[in-house]
Amino acid sequence: MGIENTRFLVVDDFSTMRRIVRNLLKELGFTNVQEAEDGVEALAKLRADIFDFVVSDWNMPNMTGIELLQNIRADAKLKHLPVLMVTAEAKKENIIMAAQAGASGYVVKPFTAATLDEKLKKIFQSMNK
């Protein structure tokens, strides 16, 4: 499977942000992108279909990104999935919390395609080791 065939799930309660992330991924050559508007919907999609990568916002109603991450890491079928946390929160304690919960990476909004590309490459490299 080529890296461009990676199946992404973009999770954010703000549709504009989902569209921005989708467009940035498209710029980077990733066209297989689905969306969910919160952690509850994301978890249902992850359990019903096959995805290779999750890009999730932190602050969402119903189930936050960190709760989604914890659910993914606790699920035997999903725990291998890389999860990139996207948030407006640049607080050190949030970065530490995300790392402790098993986030594969962390990016602060707003960000560019180059920043996203750099984070994704780091995660893909660590997956291939």
Which residues are covered by each model-predicted region?
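C-terminal output helix
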Residues: 111-120
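Active-site beta3 strand of CheY-like receiver
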Residues: 49-55
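Alpha4 helix (beta4-alpha4-beta5 surface) of REC/receiver domains from two-component response regulators
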Residues: 22, 67, 90-105
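Receiver (REC) domain active-site loop signature in two-component systems and cognate sites
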Residues: 60
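Two-component/phosphorelay signaling modules centered on CheY-like receiver
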Residues: 15-34
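Helix N-cap/capping motif at the beta->alpha junctions
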Residues: 35-44, 65
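Short amphipathic alpha-helix used as the core "switch/output" element in two-component signaling
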Residues: 44, 66-79
